[in-house]
Amino acid sequence: MMVHSPLATGPHPTTHLEPTMHQPHRSLLRKAFQMIPPLDGSLHKGQAGRIGIVGGSKDYTGAPFYSGYASLRLGSDLSHVICEPSASTVIKTYSPDLMVHSYLSSPKEPEAYASHQNQFEQLLDRLHVLVVGPGLGRDTEMQDWAEWTLKTAIQKKLHLVLDADALWLLVKKPDLLRGYPNAILTPNHVEFQRLLKACSIEPREHDDDGLLAMELSKALGGCSILQKGSIDLVAREGSEVAKVSCEGSPKRCGGQGDILSGLVGTWCAWTKLYFERQSQDEKPKSHELPISPEEAWIIAAVLGSEITRTCSRLAYHKFGRSMQSSDMLGYIGEAFEQVMHGHTKD
């Protein structure tokens, strides 16, 4: 009998299941091919995405691993985890593919704190996207680091994904993100209700149409909302609400949201890289479809959701009730192929 390691990430036997892409998304998601960095030998290391994960505290070390490693499995080149010193050694043992920085030190050690802030800020200049929240915790010092991170990243116009306890910070201080459109929030039901209350939005008992998520996007000044649930809803001010209803897994184990944040993060990096490539082209390619920035953010959120759900379904099909989030990691590549199956570059 084969026993899988708790952090097993290698490929599993191929599972033949039907593709998951849904007709309502096809016209939008066909454009996603244009956003994916080409694997044609023209790119250098890092040009397919440099991702930063801010989180990882003494009590929570798995979450940033899941987020960072998922981003690599989808196709980003480099994944940096920025965490508390006591968490760094543990996270390093999970995978040699992650670069782990113990910058989130205590202000009780002023010299080290100032040095780490400086090193962290220099690292931000090299990243395409920052995922804030996995394993962050609600400790005052970690929340202070998250606040500094958001303010600094916004000044640098970094693309952002906010999850978990970064959303707790946003509930307390919604003005931190207000008016900044280059961000995706990924709240679950409880986190979503807290955000509504923080923005003085009256909740409704039933909201399958995503209108509340749209109101939240408007209240925060145009960021994207990926509202997780039995059906994932993606809303952004000025765009139509997208619904992701493809089959996932009935097993709800810890870590799936962290995997989602890493996958969305990679798509956000690809969004940034796509528009950088477009600005460098002397004239647009005649065969390419036009993509607006608003569409690109919707694509990033929808595809992150679709791939996570498909990956979860594949893992559950193999492992059943015993499935853990670590089992999902080896299926990310196959899930990507299934989600994109049926689309053409023509």
Curated annotation (Swiss-Prot):
GO terms for molecular function: ATP binding; ATP-dependent NAD(P)H-hydrate dehydratase activity. Its EC number is 4.2.1.93. GO terms for biological process: metabolite repair; nicotinamide nucleotide metabolic process. Residues 1-20 are annotated as: Disordered. The keyword NADP applies. It catalyses: (6S)-NADHX + ATP = ADP + phosphate + NADH + H(+); (6S)-NADPHX + ATP = ADP + phosphate + NADPH + H(+). It comes from the Eukaryota. It is found in: Cytoplasm. Gene3D superfamilies: 3.40.1190.20. ATP binds at residues 228-232, 248-257. Keywords: ATP-binding, Cytoplasm, Lyase, NAD, NADP, Nucleotide-binding, Phosphoprotein. Residues 28-339 form the YjeF C-terminal domain. (6S)-NADPHX binds at residues 135, 188-194, 258. One of its GO terms (cellular component) is cytoplasm. Its cofactor is Mg(2+). PANTHER family: ATP-DEPENDENT (S)-NAD(P)H-HYDRATE DEHYDRATASE (PTHR12592:SF0), ATP-DEPENDENT (S)-NAD(P)H-HYDRATE DEHYDRATASE FAMILY MEMBER (PTHR12592). Catalyzes the dehydration of the S-form of NAD(P)HX at the expense of ATP, which is converted to ADP. Together with NAD(P)HX epimerase, which catalyzes the epimerization of the S- and R-forms, the enzyme allows the repair of both epimers of NAD(P)HX, a damaged form of NAD(P)H that is a result of enzymatic or heat-dependent hydration. Belongs to the NnrD/CARKD family. This is ATP-dependent (S)-NAD(P)H-hydrate dehydratase 2.
